[in-house]
Amino acid sequence: EIGVRLVGSEMCIRDRFIDLLRALNEVEGIERYRISSIEPNLLTDEIIAFCASSPKFQHHFHIPLQSGSDSVLARMRRRYTTEKFAERIEAVRRLMPDAFIGIDVIVGFPGETESDFRTTYEFLERLAPAYLHIFPFSERPGTPAVDFPDKVQPSVATRRVEELEELCRRLHGEFCARAEGTTDEVLFESTMRGGMMFGYTGNYRRVKAPYDRSRINTICRVRLGRMDDANDLEGEIVDN
């Protein structure tokens, strides 16, 4: 995993990022890349189309939302609205219908009302991402939010986290279950548990199969079977 921080105007960053993706696409010996975090206002149609056409860039996007309430986003000083965010998700799905979409969410931001939270919950439910990364708001010294009024009680923030975690479990299960009975390419990793090896499809569904050392760190064609309680799909290797 490599972290890249690009500095400059929004337009400059977008241009430099697509140039970086094109350069990485030409590197020999690396078969898979995943974009682990990209702001929605930087996820251009050009980047989406590039990832859809590249055999190396996997159909996986981790996009920070933080709140599904536009009033909360404004207080957070985010450069996008929920409408813009939803439009970017739709743009991804037009070209990559089965893309893994992970979303960051913060609950309990100062001033977040119960109505704001319900709006966020319903927005996420409509978007139906594959996964939610949920965080309770925590103050950071020196940031404007430290001085914001209307702090959310920790018990309220905890309850909101738990509600979104339950939503995440349901959405992730639905995403994984859609692959039952299909065939996909899986990169098996070195993890072994209970005689099984584990790996991931390009769009980040986790797959388990009987451990075979010769398959570790290789991409195998796998028939995907039943999903278990941990949302792991049973895999049967069908070729090399």
Predicted regions and their residues:
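Structural alpha-helical segments in enzyme catalytic/regulatory domains
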Residues: 50-51, 88
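Flexible glycine/acidic-rich beta-alpha junction loops that bind and position SAM and/or redox cofactors
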Residues: 9, 43-46, 65-76, 107-114, ...
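Terminal RNA-binding accessory module
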Residues: 147-240
